[in-house]
Design a protein with these regions (language model features):
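Alpha-helical transmembrane segments of multi-pass inner-membrane proteins
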Residues: 1-3, 7, 75-80, 103-111, ...
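Loop-to-helix entry and N-terminal half of a specific, functionally important transmembrane alpha helix
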Residues: 36, 221-231, 357, 361, ...
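A conserved mid-to-late transmembrane alpha helix and its immediate loop/hinge
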Residues: 233-236, 242, 347-389
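A membrane-periplasm/extracellular boundary helix in multi-pass inner-membrane enzymes
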Residues: 165-170, 237-240, 253-304, 312-319, ...
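Long extracytoplasmic/lumenal interhelical loops at the membrane interface
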Residues: 294-312, 323-370
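Transmembrane alpha-helices of multi-pass inner-membrane enzymes
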Residues: 10-14, 35, 249-254, 271, ...
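Interfacial loop-to-transmembrane-helix boundary motif in multi-pass membrane proteins
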Residues: 27-35, 89-104, 136-162, 217
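Hydrophobic transmembrane alpha-helices and their immediate junctions
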Residues: 97, 207, 254, 258, ...
Length: 484
């Protein structure tokens, strides 16, 4: 098929899926464009790459001015939205004190970074991840916001990835070892697998909800749209061939489905047992059985020696085991050069070593940049996030299962990938799940079904620009976490 014809069909297909998935009873804020654009940028390619703009100077240190400007504008607008929603924002920030402490420590760690200016700029971008999670969680209809936002991201990125892979060179590339890989709208196969993972979990959750709840409005056409999107996701998992992401999706899907079984959801102890079994199974699989995929991604033979060589070489390189090298600073410090020379001495492929800038383990990555203090803070976030998601599960098993899936897959994914880094979809969706779960547990959102009448939809965006106290005098606060 001619690529131009395929592009036209793809565009029409995306428009058709958006039309089928529309919900007339849901009127989310226009502010959702902010996290939508943010996630598309971090989940696909930098804006500078789409525009064909080459960064000036040292890309590792300076980055792209175009990308910095885009992220800065989105962050500034998001902060403005959160200020307008100050009551809900304050409640969520206080409820998520482990995340606040972690970000404050990251800010302090900028002071001992080898490049404090670069580290501080990266911390500002990291704040953007949290700000986007708060924009979603403070929406009038937060669950509907998650459904709509993630679905639209999938409608845009999934078909376009297939188009790029099948009909254009944009979706195919070669790794540093000369092996072909499918990248779709992203820069490498692991990035493609990751964005497919975080989107497909919500899509699967949507499909299950539509299958179970037969009274949903426009159920048939929405089920067709979500089912098609899920099929695209499964196809892209196969094309990307990222075993870590496939394993996380299987485990996350199993958690969503199994935890909603009557025999499990009525027994809290069984939910704990299910989560523990999944976590242990994933850990043993990735550490003992999944080494072939990780080694292949690193250009090594499928043996455990590849990963252990990386870890054994990089861990002693940390300048201070307690506080680390400084926020996002290890890979721009002299320790990186020492680490590269050590890998070369071990016989690693030089072009691969040259571009090596992560430990392929999220926990070790945090240790390198933030030391044991950072690792403990990440562990605190995961534990508190699990507890909050479990409390939501007791109130609403359907919603709680999604939050549990994101917390679980976030912890599992970081066993073999740097999943706790800024501008990483795994980290962003982990924040969304934890912040949203905190909103439920804090009683910030009502539990009944909430629909915005059509007569109010035209005023919704005007109200969004008003101070929160004034808006509450105009209409009752909305947004039920149990309502769709």
């Amino acid at each position: 098929m001619n690529p131009s014809v395929a592009s036209l069909i793809c565009a029409c297909g995306i428009a058709g899926l958006l039309y089928l998935d529309r919900e007339k009873t849901v009127h989310s804020s226009r502010a959702l464009w902010l996290p939508g654009i943010w996630i598309v940028m971090v989940g696909s390619r930098p804006l500078s790459q789409w525009l064909g703009v080459s960064p000036a100077g040292n890309e590792q240190l300076d980055g792209s001015p175009v990308d910095a400007a885009a992220f800065g504008v989105l962050l500034a607008i998001a902060i403005g939205v959160l200020i307008r929603r100050k009551s809900r924002t304050r409640t969520l920030l206080l409820a998520n004190w482990p995340i606040l402490i972690c970000f404050l420590y990251f800010l302090v760690s900028v002071t001992w970074s080898y490049h404090p200016d670069v580290s501080f700029k990266r911390w500002i971008k990291a704040i953007g991840d949290l700000a986007m999670a708060l924009v979603i969680a403070t929406d009038r209809q937060p669950v509907a916001a998650i459904r709509r936002l993630v679905s639209r991201i999938g409608f845009l990125l999934f078909p376009t990835s297939v188009l790029f892979i099948k009909y254009y060179d944009l979706g195919r590339a070669f790794d540093d070892d000369g092996m072909p890989m499918n990248t779709g709208v992203t820069t490498n196969k692991n990035a493609l697998g990751l964005i497919v993972l975080v989107v497909s979990l919500v899509v699967l959750w949507n499909v299950r909800s539509l299958l179970i709840n037969k009274n949903e409005p426009n159920r048939g056409r929405r089920l067709l749209a979500q089912g098609t999107l899920l099929a695209f996701g499964l196809w892209l998992f196969w094309l990307a061939n990222s075993s870590t992401c496939k394993a996380c999706f299987i485990l996350g899907s199993f958690l969503i489905i199994a935890s909603n079984l009557r025999a499990i959801r009525r027994r809290p102890a069984r939910v704990h047992a299910l989560c523990l079994i999944i976590l242990l199974a994933a850990g043993f699989t990735l550490l003992l059985g999944g080494q072939a995929d990780v080694a292949q991604a690193l250009g090594r033979a499928p043996s455990m020696s590849g990963r252990t060589e990386i870890w054994a070489s990089v861990i002693p390189m940390v300048p201070n085991s307690i506080v680390g090298a400084g926020f996002e600073s290890f890979w721009i410090s002299p320790s990186m050069e020492i680490f590269h020379r050590k890998l070369l001495d071990l016989g690693w492929y030089p072009p691969l070593v040259k571009h090596f800038n992560e430990a392929h383990n999220g926990y070790i990555e945090v240790y390198l940049n933030s030391g044991w203090i950072g690792v403990c803070l990440i562990a605190l976030i995961l534990i508190s996030g699990y507890r909050r998601a479990l409390k939501v599960f007791h109130r609403d098993p359907e919603l709680g299962s999604l939050f549990l899936a994101y917390v679980g897959t976030g912890a599992i994914y970081s066993i073999t990938e740097a999943g706790f880094r800024m501008l990483n979809p795994s980290w962003i969706f982990l924040l969304i799940a934890i912040v949203s779960a905190s909103g439920v547990n804090a009683g910030l959102f009502g539990g009944g079904k909430h629909e915005v009448p059509a007569s109010r939809s035209r005023r919704a965006d005007f109200h969004e620009l008003m101070p929160e106290r004034e808006r509450e005098t105009v209409h009752a606060p909305g947004g039920g976490f149990n309502a769709i």
